[in-house]
């Protein structure tokens, strides 16, 4: 664990509890997502990104991931990666027949720019 991670764990009882749950269920996408969101709230974008990418690697069908991953990439000034996250999420949402998520992802991608900007 890095010094920053240890400091954040000490300053965030919620993060400490989530990490304890996660140690018992390391592949649980909901817990991974909750930890990522907690790191985001603590302004540790790199740790948040690492957890989002862990979800994508372990549970790529977790549709809730892609909108937040894309938004984080936007925050990190990585629009190409944001575009790719939204596009991948749209495919996952289509397969899951999740029209609400599909609409949110399509809207986020549209707000990012035109397809010609990213393909």
Residue ranges and their predicted role:
Residues 24, 58, 92-96:
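Structural marker of alpha-solenoid helical repeat scaffolds
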Residues 80-84, 108-119:
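Alpha-helical linker/edge segments of TPR/alpha-solenoid repeat scaffolds
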């Amino acid at each position: 664990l890095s010094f920053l991670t240890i400091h954040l764990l000490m300053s965030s009882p919620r993060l400490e509890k989530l990490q304890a749950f996660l140690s018992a269920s390391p592949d649980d996408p909901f817990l991974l997502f909750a930890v990522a969101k907690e790191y985001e709230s603590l302004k540790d974008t790199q740790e948040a990104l690492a957890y989002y990418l862990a979800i994508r690697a372990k549970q790529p069908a977790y549709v809730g991931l892609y909108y937040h991953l894309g938004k984080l990439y936007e925050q990190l000034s990585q629009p190409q990666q944001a575009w790719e996250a939204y596009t991948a999420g749209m495919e996952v949402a289509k397969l899951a027949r999740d029209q609400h998520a599909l609409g949110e992802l399509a809207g986020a991608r549209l707000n990012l720019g035109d397809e010609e900007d990213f393909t």
